[in-house]
């Protein structure tokens, strides 16, 4: 009888346990399902509740279209290449200075605009507003470009600005002369129409962004700091409009960068005794270093998906995916581990999951029959927002775990702070309003820049740095960035001018609408 009672109690316990598990699973699925069909993180804006400041419209005439296109092409034809921090094309930068002065006469002659050359080749414009109580903002772009070689397979010479099927080809068309010329062209049109801003703003054009901005952006910031300038927000290049680039996403999306990954380059070196190849030692400097590099590649940095801005990106986009992706992305609190394992399979999405490891240089040896005494390698890490530079260096040390390998940091910096992007974030909401006002079909989401810009130098004078330009990228276009056949459509360049024209006026809004004004109506 006792045995029977014991079995009965055990069976009762198992039934209760099974019921609890089943109930928990059903509850989880119910919560996840409800969240899937209700999560829609600020997909649009209710424009009726916004203060209306736009009084000037831009209807481009045929002659204006021809002129703005000619101005842009002239900018592309000037090879403002930055090779290294100490080697830039100074004659091209001087020529570019002359171009700006000739094609934007209102900008350089208006009493509202103060122009200063900084660091010999960079430009700072101060556009005076009528209300000194409004905190100023700043628009950034950069004049310099990376090198380009026609022999790499360009369809047109990289500094020809040649038109092919409605596109302008050339280095700088999407990085970043479309913003340089677009910003100044928009300001030129506004000044021609008698525009006076309510809110003071600045325009900063760096000349060495591609080589860290140490003479351009750094000196612009020093000048502004010396004057006690504090900025409401900064808008620089970074992310773009992605149309068909994100697999499974219904419609195009505008991603506004709210942070950048950190970065460090580490030098690994091994020194041993040299020798002749006829009497090789058990281990060589090359072999020891190769083993260290292999350990770094075979043991990637930990998965951190969901602990940085990428979570907000996926949640903002979730409602534009079909099932089952919508179900998964709407419930990252439940599915982050699963999704991270899927994303890490491809290099372009693995960058969202972790700090990436890239072996970029490996040098050793002077002759085929001499065993070298020295070998060195350089490894670049792009640091996830949830990690620090110090944590990465410690993981490198523990992963290699070989005292014979000397580890030195060449350079590095932590991930950039995450800029605000909620309903009361002035900069983010103004940019979003401008994007949706022009392209109501877009979904706008915050994003993370896996590359770096010189906007990081502005951290001391603003809390919010955003990285976006309305360049449209279709499948294959992201590879043109710093690559072969960089190009922009004529229509898209006109849209960029329109975007900045509208953005400057939208920034004259004094206050954002009350919270919870976001609707799904735009």
From Swiss-Prot:
GO MF annotations for this entry? aminoacylase activity; hydrolase activity, acting on carbon-nitrogen (but not peptide) bonds, in linear amides; lyase activity; metal ion binding; metallocarboxypeptidase activity
- Cite the InterPro entries for this sequence: Bact_exopeptidase_dim_dom, Pept_M20_carboxypep, Pept_M20A, Peptidase_M20, Peptidase_M20_dimer
Q: List cofactor names only.
A: Zn(2+)
Q: Where does the UniProt annotation place the signal sequence?
A: 1-35
Any single GO BP term = amide catabolic process
Name the residues annotated as catalytic in the UniProt entry.
Answer: 144, 209
EC class, as a word, reads hydrolase
Q: Which SUPFAM superfamilies match?
A: Bacterial exopeptidase dimerisation domain, Zn-dependent exopeptidases
Q: Nucleotidyltransferase among the record's keywords? A: no
Residues reported in the UniProt entry to bind Zn(2+) 1: 175, 210, 482
Q: Which residues are glycosylated?
A: 52, 89, 120
Name the pathway.
Amino-acid metabolism; Energy metabolism; electron transfer; Lipid metabolism; fatty acid metabolism
What are its E.C. numbers? 3.5.1.114, 3.5.1.14
**Cofactor binding notes:** Binds 2 Zn(2+) ions per subunit.
Fetch the Pfam families from UniProt. M20_dimer, Peptidase_M20
What is the annotated role of this protein in its UniProt record? Answer: Secreted enzyme that regulates the endogenous N-fatty acyl amino acid (NAAs) tissue and circulating levels by functioning as a bidirectional NAA synthase/hydrolase. It condenses free fatty acids and free amino acids to generate NAAs and bidirectionally catalyzes the reverse hydrolysis reaction. Some of these NAAs stimulate oxidative metabolism via mitochondrial uncoupling, increasing energy expenditure in a UPC1-independent manner. Thereby, this secreted protein may indirectly regulate whole body energy expenditure.
Name of the protein in its database record = N-fatty-acyl-amino acid synthase/hydrolase PM20D1.2
């Amino acid at each position: 009888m006792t045995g029977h009672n014991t079995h009965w109690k055990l069976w009762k316990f198992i039934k209760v346990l099974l019921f609890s598990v089943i109930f928990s699973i059903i509850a989880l699925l119910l919560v996840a399902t409800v969240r899937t069909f209700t999560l829609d993180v600020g997909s649009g804006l209710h424009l009726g509740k916004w203060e209306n400041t736009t009084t000037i419209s831009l209807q481009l005439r045929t002659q204006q279209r021809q002129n703005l296109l000619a101005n842009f092409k002239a900018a592309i034809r000037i090879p403002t290449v930055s090779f290294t921090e100490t080697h830039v094309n100074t004659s091209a930068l001087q020529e570019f200075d002359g171009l700006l002065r000739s094609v934007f006469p209102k900008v350089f002659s208006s009493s509202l605009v103060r122009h200063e050359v900084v660091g010999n080749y960079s430009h700072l414009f101060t556009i005076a507003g009528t209300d000194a109580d409004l905190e100023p903002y700043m628009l950034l772009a950069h004049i310099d470009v990376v090198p380009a070689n026609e022999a790499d397979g360009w369809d047109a010479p990289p500094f020809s600005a040649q038109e092919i099927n409605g596109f302008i080809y050339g280095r700088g068309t999407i990085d970043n002369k479309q913003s340089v010329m677009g910003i100044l062209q928009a300001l030129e049109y506004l000044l021609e129409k008698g525009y006076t801003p309510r809110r003071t703003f600045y325009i900063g054009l760096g000349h060495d962004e591609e080589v860290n901005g140490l003479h351009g952006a750094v000196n612009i910031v020093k000048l502004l700091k010396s004057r006690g300038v504090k900025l409401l927000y900064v808008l620089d290049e970074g992310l773009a409009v992605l149309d068909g680039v994100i697999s499974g996403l219904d419609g195009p999306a505008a991603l506004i960068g709210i942070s950048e990954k950190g970065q460090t380059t580490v030098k690994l070196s091994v020194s041993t005794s040299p020798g002749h190849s006829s009497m090789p030692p058990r281990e060589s400097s090359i072999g020891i270093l190769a083993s260290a590099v292999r350990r770094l590649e075979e043991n990637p940095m930990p998965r951190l998906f969901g602990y940085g801005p990428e979570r907000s990106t996926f949640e903002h986009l979730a409602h534009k995916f079909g099932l089952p992706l919508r179900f998964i992305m709407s419930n990252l609190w439940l599915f982050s581990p699963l999704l991270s394992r899927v994303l890490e399979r491809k290099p372009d999405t693995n960058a969202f999951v972790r700090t990436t490891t890239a072996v970029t240089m490996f040098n050793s040896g002077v002759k085929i029959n001499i065993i070298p005494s020295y070998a060195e390698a350089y490894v670049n890490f792009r640091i996830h927002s949830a990690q620090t530079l110090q944590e990465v260096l410690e993981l490198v040390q523990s992963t290699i775990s070989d005292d014979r390998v000397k580890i030195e940091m060449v350079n590095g910096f932590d991930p950039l702070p995450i800029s605000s992007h909620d309903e009361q974030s002035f900069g983010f909401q103004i940019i979003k309003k401008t994007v949706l006002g022009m392209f109501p079909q877009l979904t706008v989401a915050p994003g993370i820049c896996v590359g770096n810009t010189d906007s990081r130098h502005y951290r001391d004078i603003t809390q919010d740095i955003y990285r976006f330009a309305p360049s449209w990228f279709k499948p294959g276009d992201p590879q043109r960035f710093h690559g072969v056949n960089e190009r922009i459509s004529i229509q898209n360049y006109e849209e960029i001018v329109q975007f900045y024209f509208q953005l400057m006026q939208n920034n004259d809004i004094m206050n954002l609408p009350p919270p919870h004004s976001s609707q799904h109506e735009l």
